Amino acid sequence: MASGKVEKMASIDAQLRLLAPKKVSEDDKLVEYDALLLDRFLDILESLHGSGIRETVQELYEHAAEYERTHDTKKLEELGNLITSLDAGDSIVIAKSFSQMLNLANLAEEVQLAYRRRIKKTKKGDFADESSAITESDFEETLRRLVDLKKSPEEIFATLKNQTVDLVLTAHPTQSVRRSLLQKHGRIRDCLSQLYAKDISPDDKQELDEALQRAIQAAFRTDEIRRVQPTPQDEMRMGMSYFHETIWKGVPKFLRRVDTALKNIGINERVPYNVPLIQFSSWMGGDRDGNPRVTPEVTRDVVLLARMMAANMYFTQITDLMFELSMWRCNDEVRARAQELHSQSKSDAKHYIEFWKQIPLSEPYRVILGDVRDKLYNTREHAHKLLANGSSDVPEESTFTHIDQFLEPLELCYKSLCASGDQPIADGSLLDFMRQVSTFGLSLVKLDIRQESDRHTEVMDAITTHLGIGSYRSWSEEKRQEWLLSELRGKRPLFGSDLPMSYEVADAIGTFRVLAELPNDSFGAYIISMATAPSDVLAVELLQRECGIKKPLRVVPLFEKLADLQSAAASMTRLFSIDWYKNRINGTQEVMIGYSDSGKDAGRLSAAWQLYKVQEQLIQVAKEYGVKLTMFHGRGGTVGRGGGPTHLALLSQPPDTIHGSLRVTIQGEVIEQSFGEEHLCFRTLERYTAATLEHGIDPPTSPKPEWRALMDEMAVITTKEYRSVVLQEPRFVEYFRSATPELEYGRMNIGSRPAKRKPGGGIETLRAIPWIFSWTQTRFHLPVWLGCGAAFKHVIEKDIKNLAMLKDMYNQWSFFRVTIDLLEMVFAKGDPGIAALYDKLLVKDELKPFGENLRKSYLEAQKFLLEIAGHKDPLDADPYLKQILRLRDPYTTTLNVFQVYTLKRIRDPSFHVTVRPHLSKEMDANSLAADLVKLNPTSEYPPGLEDTLILTMKGIAAGMQNTG
């Protein structure tokens, strides 16, 4: 390495060490990883754009790092002066550079997280962030802990065999990084991991370093900005890419680890292959709530695409299995089946690469698997032709139409191998394959359908109006129930082709007809958002029957807003008391609770407590009626939308509310963090399985009555304070839209769904995602903390003994600890100084006191929270996360300053800036700017501003790791 390069590298390392001077564990290599990636990136930047750009990037970084050390707001203004003097081309290059550096920092963290040993001495329960997952047990530790609690291995195994975790990948991919970049990020992560492996040869190291530089340059040269809004089909393909990359192979690998962990506590038996500990569902192409782009045709497309992908993934594996199972010894059943298939096989299969000639009877397993291969090939072709042409000439009898048809020959081979003394062989690739079949079926994922209750009301209103019996919409709840039940008990058809239909009604009915047409095993639940009453559920049951769905989907009400959560138990009581409905559900019911809209409606603390209570109430109602209830947690990736670390968030749920059956959303913005890399995928599967098992066998204790009373009191104050600002202050919407990039959010083309449920209107019409996203961008996180400070202050000033009680709650009650620690993590990521800069530049003078008061509330809430947690500064008890944030902050701060000054220039054309000479080393000073303008020829703003703004949004989202 040349001396100049050594000096640059040492300089970068020194700067990072100023921010994070101490290692947090023996195996802490985060600063080394960061320094290597940053050094390679800056070298690439210099080679592409010259030393002037590199020096400016480093100068901006140093100003931002100085601000992070001193919090002197003059440094922000100095940053602003440097940034506004850049010309359009340089501005985009430098904003893109900081966004890239944040992505690289995240990749360094993922590598560190995937490989570091656990820090044993960290204080128990410090679980502020997913990435601090020190207290998140691996599966083997969970089993050992349960055995230490005097739970027998047999009890643990029996409980495990009866549990299922269904992970639901959501349709609105708030994942703001393009798939093209995610793949390049994967290569960077792999190279970095291998570079630090033991016993790496000098040649390997050099080649890996070159590969790393190629991947970094390829990522930097890829346009970060989606120029076209993704369709629901695009979203689905992106979600499914994780199955290709990690999940497909990750599931059998994880289940094998479960077997090993069980063996280590004395269970000499494997988890049965047909026990699906993990299942996967999706909303991609099924979630039509507020998204007019999800049509019946889209739903049909994504179902057929998923079936084609599933058949293809099985097909690509079956040849390896045929190579492995070359044995001749078998039982009589396998021999007879092989002879039968052999006699039916007429000709060679020239479209196969391996085993294309007729397989001899001396290889019976291969004969049987050859028939499985033929059917998989035909299954794939059948789905492909239906998808491409709308029809298929592949005979259905030559395909797999049901999972039992697929599993049966595999089971036959498995049992024969075991009976022939070859169980070790049976428990190899064949067992892995059977576990994949049990987990993924023929559909890869089960598609949930989600629609808002009002759309079903429109359909029913069209029907009753056409029948001449009045307007369903104007009927009371009692009259609606009476009519729906009379129709459900009867058999007459409700409507025919002469039913007058609006576009919305036709779309809703078209969805039910697609459900009737497609294979039933492709679908999961039919979820009704904004559910408020039993008639919402009965209407969907009736529409399923009317449209000819032979095996109706289970109907799941989703309770979201505070008032709906409060009345959820009463609604389910009324439903369970209806004989027709009780017979229909056959003793099982699923209810979904929404974290996003409840938080937007009432504030995070109130929503969290109401969600806790509603689960207790619903479980009690279900017990009274002899119904097994599954809770479906609609958690967002961000704290404002119910996000947080998996293991402890689940363990903080009320006792008896999981019961071995759990559904939970994996939101778009955390899919990459959960499944983007092999080790991350493994940890995700491990966390959910371990937490569900632990909650079932060793449930958390219930809160004391006095704790409940205090929470009730604080929830009332929180909601009152939150709503007094967000919903009742007449100029709040004006302030919100001035002080955040909410108005510009739609330009990001993040997902296929509109940002609003309805055009116009205030905060109540805004979806929870852009609401959270906008405040995350300004580092103010208002929806998470607003109201908390007022609640803490009220109860402590009312009686100082309440402070001691709050401290007891924090130390003894997992729900309260999780809630407080998540708040603390948000305060660690927040910065009221940055938020003040947005106000200074973007908000009218008469609205500025609004922001000043909110920042006082922020600091007050933080003060009380730290007092309750017994910490001097945020994250005192979590050095690992504190280190991560310190290393990340200078990048994020630079992007914040970029963003606020760009917003100022967009919104205020009279804002004057003096542009200095072009820095980038292009042949022509205007060529880079011209090229970048060509990427966005329709922008209504001066050259470079719109792209710079979007790049800052993406970068800050990467820095916060909560895009909304």
UniProtKB/Swiss-Prot annotation:
Q: Which domain of life is it from?
A: Eukaryota
Q: What is its EC number?
A: 4.1.1.31
Cofactor(s) needed for function: Mg(2+)
Tell me the residues on which Phosphoserine occurs: 11
Taken from the UniProt entry, a GO cellular component term is: chloroplast
Q: How does it assemble?
A: Homotetramer.
Family (UniProt): Belongs to the PEPCase type 1 family.
Protein purpose: Through the carboxylation of phosphoenolpyruvate (PEP) it forms oxaloacetate, a four-carbon dicarboxylic acid source for the tricarboxylic acid cycle.
Q: What protein name applies here?
A: Phosphoenolpyruvate carboxylase
